[in-house]
A protein has these predicted regions:
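Surface-exposed assembly/interface segments
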Residues: 1-191
């Protein structure tokens, strides 16, 4: 999911390289990484394998940077095992890493190919997280739509959610700028 809503988010593409040297060699973004993903120390210690992926976030449409194809973020050697840890005990789970660090996307899950390979499950003895993952996948964001300004009734409906002081504690609310003086007065008076 794009952190920038609307059409701006449609400019984003996420590319994921699996732990496969052939896929890595053919991947458009291989020069942004030192080596192909493989098996993390965490998975190796549990006798599991092939849990690492590389993730890049790209300004595919050029709307964010002005240049199509600009790599915005890189996440090397992150794991698809949900319990993956680095040597210092911090998480190395791809979903956690992306969600904590990305300025452009929020990762809600894995596609069906990765889910079928065990993405999002814990690393257990004998797990091989890469069966069938033979090429990089690109996920281009779509369906974002720009919205117009909120109407007076939409603003009032939103503020109504905060009216019961016994249910919701709010110190203050700020009225948005409205298109006309009459609308502004209506919103301010409702507060």
């Amino acid at each position: 999911i794009a952190r920038y809503p609307g059409e701006l988010g449609n400019s984003i593409q996420v590319s994921i390289c699996p732990p496969n040297s052939t896929a890595f060699d053919a991947w458009s973004y291989k020069d942004d990484f030192d080596a192909a993903p493989g098996t993390s120390s965490h998975a190796s210690n549990k006798n599991a394998s092939n849990d690492e992926i590389h993730v890049v976030v790209v300004d595919n449409g050029g709307e964010l940077t002005g240049t199509k194809g600009t790599v915005l973020e890189r996440y090397p050697f992150v794991s698809i095992a949900s319990d993956a840890k680095n040597a210092d005990g911090t998480t190395n789970y791809a979903k956690d890493i992306v969600n904590a660090r990305s300025e452009y996307i929020h990762m809600v899950g894995f596609d069906s190919d990765y889910a079928g390979a065990g993405a999002g499950t814990t690393a257990d003895s004998g797990d091989n997280f890469s069966p069938g993952l033979t090429s990089a996948t690109d996920h281009t964001f779509t369906k974002g739509a720009n919205s117009g300004a909120l109407t007076t009734s939409e603003v009032l409906t939103g503020f109504d959610l905060f009216e019961d002081k016994d249910i919701v504690e709010v110190d203050f609310l700020v009225a948005p700028s409205m298109n006309s003086r009459a609308d502004q007065t209506t919103v301010v008076n409702d507060l």
